Amino acid sequence: MTSRVVSPEQNPNDAEMSLRPQSLDDFVGQRQVCENLKVFISAARARGEALDHVLFHGPPGLGKTTLAQIMARELGVGFRATSGPVIQRAGDLAALLTNLEPRDVLFIDEIHRLNPAIEEVLYPAMEDFQLDLIIGEGPAARSVRIELPPFTLVGATTRSGLLTTPLRERFGIPCRMNFYEPAELEAIVSRGARVLGFALTPDGAAEVARRSRGTPRVAGRLLRRVRDFAVVAGRSPVDALVADAALNRLEVDRIGLDAMDRRYLRCIAENYGGGPVGVETLAAALSESRDTLEEVVEPYLLQQGMIQRTPRGRMLSASGFKHIGLNPPKDLLVQLDLLTRMDEEGE
């Protein structure tokens, strides 16, 4: 998949660490999560114990890694980071765990992609702070138990449904990360402009925030691109007109949809009469992977009410048709109304 400026996935060019908040008090958004973490961190420090294991789950780009780093900083302990696909063997996990200091934070991104065999080794490490390893092969093989210092495992996943039940149940503090409100994103964008050292008016910040898809990572990326256009054009301070012109050049529309999103909507509308159409069929038609559609493209379209997921496939809503300048077929509106009523009765 080609790189998208509105993609919530991590991009090497996003590594501007100065834009990240350094404490829970500086962290904008996810208020309930932050308030709860403050309590748990204070209690752990008062007891002199390791914080219970934490699981952050939700769409990408919402601050899971940043919160994990802040937790370690506020606990006053070390921070180690890795990701699920990187840990291939039990020895890799053992090397990570045995090098931790007491109460350190170990962050595993994409924890749903851990090898099942690695999960089995991780269970006693999380529960009893012990590592059981098999040394050698055949008749000479023997089990070795390694005592570990108490530590905090922080897992992050964009697909909590793929976590096995035993692993999920070992996290004492599950935290759901939600998309950000426009006012929260405006505060993030305004702070980002100050950190990057350029003048941004309140209406300029609102324009960038409105197109950021409820995601701070996208907001930071759009802000840097708007800054580039403003520097070349010699415009300061950056107001809504400058931001609008820059974002239009990037093909990011008024609600944050880009060319890929509009292609997705048009494919359902024009090729399949608004749906329903299966995700595999859509992936083939758009030359994208199923995972890309489910994890990157669809979450924001669902949140905006542009599409519906049904047992028979994806359907375009009336607002989805309207956004691409088309009128929905009457029979499709009847189907959507029926599905809505069925959902309401099911609740």
From Swiss-Prot:
One of its GO terms (biological process) is DNA repair. Mg(2+) binds at residue 65. ATP binds at residues 19-20, 61, 64-66, 127-129, 170, 180, 217. It catalyses: ATP + H2O = ADP + phosphate + H(+). Residues 254-347 are annotated as: Head domain (RuvB-H). Has 3 domains, the large (RuvB-L) and small ATPase (RuvB-S) domains and the C-terminal head (RuvB-H) domain. The head domain binds DNA, while the ATPase domains jointly bind ATP, ADP or are empty depending on the state of the subunit in the translocation cycle. During a single DNA translocation step the structure of each domain remains the same, but their relative positions change. This is Holliday junction branch migration complex subunit RuvB. It comes from Paramagnetospirillum magneticum (strain ATCC 700264 / AMB-1). The lineage of its organism: Bacteria, Pseudomonadati, Pseudomonadota, Alphaproteobacteria, Rhodospirillales. The gene is ruvB.
